[in-house]
């Protein structure tokens, strides 16, 4: 496939990277929920899952393990909503024969696959493409940015939890963004409080406000906080649309606020 990268992204209006300095902070959760929120706002959305060693988004969207087909323009993405075709996804999970198979690859092979993902997926018309990256700053991140140079990247959303150990890692992620001239669209504090499944009261089981404080210290925008909600966790495990199922929840309000803030900043 000799896609140029730019050709298959020509009809993509906005590209957002979702980054985290540390694993386990819920980066893929935020990516998934933002994609669903954008779709509910009437946008056509794509997710490029380049977390090669831990591709979890196909399960969160309950797309199973479909075959990836090719057309004249390249790989055809998988749709989480085959009828409406408003939410497209491409992930290495679709290319593995066994879902339990470990991806034990050296940097050059990872870089080559990411290059294919960026250049050879026939997204068609998209309002927003979300790129879900692995934690840290690695070959994968550099490969994504290098392959997206021909296309304008709007910026990055950084995900952290409230604890100092997580915000410390995000500081390094901010340094990475500055060194690579990647605009920071804002910081999301995930797992900010725990929503009781019985009374819906939110209690702080971790420290609180670390993400907002980090945003102030680094001059970044603070997009908002998302609580640790058992209903959200259950929805992701079952591949259900949390935003559609629980529109009365405070977590719905938090995610919708973050999504709307991003849409406004993009003028999307």
From Swiss-Prot:
Keyword Nucleotide-binding carried by entry: yes
Cofactor binding summary note: Binds 4 [4Fe-4S] clusters per heterotetramer. Contains two stable clusters in the N-termini of nubp1 and two labile, bridging clusters between subunits of the nubp1-nubp2 heterotetramer.
Binding site for [4Fe-4S] cluster: 196, 199
GO terms, molecular function: 4 iron, 4 sulfur cluster binding; ATP binding; ATP-dependent FeS chaperone activity; iron-sulfur cluster binding; metal ion binding
InterPro entries on file: Mrp/NBP35_ATP-bd (IPR019591), NUBP2/Cfd1_eukaryotes (IPR028600), P-loop_NTPase (IPR027417), YlxH/NBP35 (IPR033756)
Subunit structure: Heterotetramer of 2 nubp1 and 2 nubp2 chains.
Recorded family membership: Belongs to the Mrp/NBP35 ATP-binding proteins family. NUBP2/CFD1 subfamily.
The name this protein goes by in its record: Cytosolic Fe-S cluster assembly factor nubp2
Protein species of origin: Danio rerio
Protein's gene: nubp2
């Amino acid at each position: 496939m000799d896609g140029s990268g730019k050709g298959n992204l020509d009809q993509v209006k906005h590209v957002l990277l979702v980054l985290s300095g540390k694993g386990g902070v819920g980066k893929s959760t935020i990516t998934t929920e933002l994609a669903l929120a954008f779709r509910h706002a009437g946008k056509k959305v794509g997710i490029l899952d380049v977390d090669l060693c831990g591709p979890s988004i196909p399960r969160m969207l309950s797309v199973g393990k479909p075959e990836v087909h090719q057309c004249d323009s390249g790989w055809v993405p998988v749709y989480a909503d085959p009828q409406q075709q408003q939410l497209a996804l491409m992930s290495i999970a679709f290319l593995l024969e066994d879902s339990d198979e470990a991806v034990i690859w050296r940097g050059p092979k990872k870089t080559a696959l990411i290059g294919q993902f960026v250049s050879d997926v026939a997204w068609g018309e998209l309002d927003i493409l979300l790129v879900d990256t692995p934690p840290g700053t690695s070959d994968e991140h550099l490969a994504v940015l290098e392959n997206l140079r021909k296309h304008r990247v709007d910026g990055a959303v950084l995900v952290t939890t409230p604890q100092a150990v997580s915000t410390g890692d995000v500081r390094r992620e901010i340094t990475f963004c500055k060194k690579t001239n990647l605009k920071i669209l804002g910081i999301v504090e995930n797992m900010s409080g725990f929503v009781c499944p019985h009374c819906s009261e939110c209690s702080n089981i971790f420290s609180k406000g670390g993400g907002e404080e980090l945003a102030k210290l680094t001059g970044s925008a603070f997009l908002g906080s998302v609580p640790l909600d058992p209903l959200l966790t259950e929805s992701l495990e079952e591949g259900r649309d949390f935003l559609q199922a629980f529109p009365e929840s405070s977590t719905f309000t938090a995610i919708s606020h973050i999504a709307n803030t991003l849409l406004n900043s993009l003028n999307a």
